[in-house]
Amino acid sequence: MLQLYNTLTNQKEKFEPLNPGKVTMYVCGPTVYNYIHIGNARSAVAFDTIRRYLEYRGFEVNYVSNFTDVDDKIIKASQEMNLSVKEITEKFINAFYEDTSALNVKKATLNPRVMDNMDDIIKFIEVLVQKGYAYESAGDVYYKTRKFKDYGKLSGQLIDDLEQGASSRVDDIDQDKKQDPLDFALWKKVKQGEISWNSPWGQGRPGWHIECSVMSTKYLGDTIDIHAGGQDLEFPHHENEIAQSEAKTGKKFARYWLHNGFVTIGEEDQKMSKSLGNFVTVHDLLKKVNPQVIRFFMSTTQYRRPIRYSSANLNEAKVNLNKLQTAYENLSYRLKDSVEGNDKEVEVNFANLEKDFVKVMDDDFNVQNGISVVYEMAKQLNVYSEKEKVYTDTINNLINTYKKVVEIFGISFSEEKELLDDTIEQLIQERNEARKNKNFKRSDEIRDLLKEQGIILEDTAQGTRWKRND
């Protein structure tokens, strides 16, 4: 039974989508004014892993993730770079696709943009005004926070506590325009030099929170199965989305709320963020680290937990990933000398491991326990590859199951164009052990396996050297 931790109720709940077998999932996407950093990518990877697991479990997932292409930060960046808002956003949307593709994040069913949905945003705000949940003030439109009686139900914030801190979050001009300090902007009056659209309230642009309410309900319906994003979006962004959407439709906005943990950096485990200037972009990291290693590093921590970014943790991910790939290479190679038939006992034991994997992953996508099962699978591949007699059907059965499970983490051995250096070193070490133990059959197998991958070995008095046969 698949259970999710629902932030709305602060407990694990049995997952039952509105329509059996089909899942609607909305993930808050990036504001496209710069390259994404590792913290941004964590959200994309975490929810891609969850999506992959849902699909593995047989669900059809309609996965929508937006691009915020109108925002104060984008306008500021366009002015600093002397580029149009459109030029800035196109550049960094393309960069986002390149970076996430390198990390093997599946493309969303749809990536809607704010600019493309402006008419719907304006209509949505008009309904809120007509229903008395919003009001115009000097060209701005604000949401009446107190009118929505369930405000705070996601984050646990109390209206009285919010009121005490409201003055510290808004400037004096906003205070003068608002009927209540807690009200938030749905539409902002145009300022000189800013991009704007015509509306019933004059020229302006949407506030941040309204866009996700509009695009999620437009493309997925009034009630979504899963709404997801970073923990920093829980309040006020997701809280405001609920207020806007449920005021308009009168229906529950999202049934399950999932929030991923931060990526931290440094000795004090600070949250990685652009505002703190302590970030590492995926664009830069990809120049130094294999993308599969980055993906594995981020996809093997349970989504609600923080991840500590460090060279040591990346290296650990690389070592573990190489072990998984080596196991795959070892058993794949034995297809050459395998015989027809199968080994039922081996296949049953491996099938039981897959059941163990499902059991732990069904517990709120516990990838840390899940990857432990995968390591045991890799161990069993190595054990079987060492057998004197191996069966073709069993090898194919084990490899297909193994690949199917590993691909949930975004790792695809079939797409590897060449072996990682560490994988080569590991195979050479295994070959040296085989030679030491006078297991020359295994030693020759590893040599031939590497040769097929274009790796030439040279045994010297100082040890085994290798080079790529380009």
Swiss-Prot record:
Group of enzyme by EC: ligase
Motif annotated as 'KMSKS' region, chain positions: 271-275
Official protein name in the record: Cysteine--tRNA ligase
Intrachain S-S bonds: none
EC number per UniProt: 6.1.1.16
Subunit: Monomer.
Protein's UniProt keywords contain RNA-binding: no
UniProt key word Membrane: no
Residues that hold ATP according to the record: K274
Organism of derivation: Ligilactobacillus salivarius (strain UCC118) (Lactobacillus salivarius)
InterPro entries hit by this protein: Cys-tRNA-ligase, Cys-tRNA-synt_Ia_DALR, Cys-tRNA/MSH_ligase, CysS_C, Rossmann-like_a/b/a_fold, tRNA-synt_1_cat_dom, tRNAsynth_Ia_anticodon-bd
Gene Ontology molecular function: any one: ATP binding
Entry's localization field: Cytoplasm
GO cellular component: cytosol
GO biological process, alphabetically ordered: cysteinyl-tRNA aminoacylation
Necessary cofactors: Zn(2+)
The encoding gene: cysS
UniProt record similarity statement: Belongs to the class-I aminoacyl-tRNA synthetase family.
Cofactor binding note of this UniProt entry: Binds 1 zinc ion per subunit.
Main location: cytoplasm
Catalytic reactions of this protein: tRNA(Cys) + L-cysteine + ATP = L-cysteinyl-tRNA(Cys) + AMP + diphosphate
Motif placement: 'HIGH' region: 30-40
Key words of the record: Aminoacyl-tRNA synthetase, ATP-binding, Cytoplasm, Ligase, Metal-binding, Nucleotide-binding, Protein biosynthesis, Zinc
Residues binding Zn(2+), per UniProt: C28, C212, H237, E241
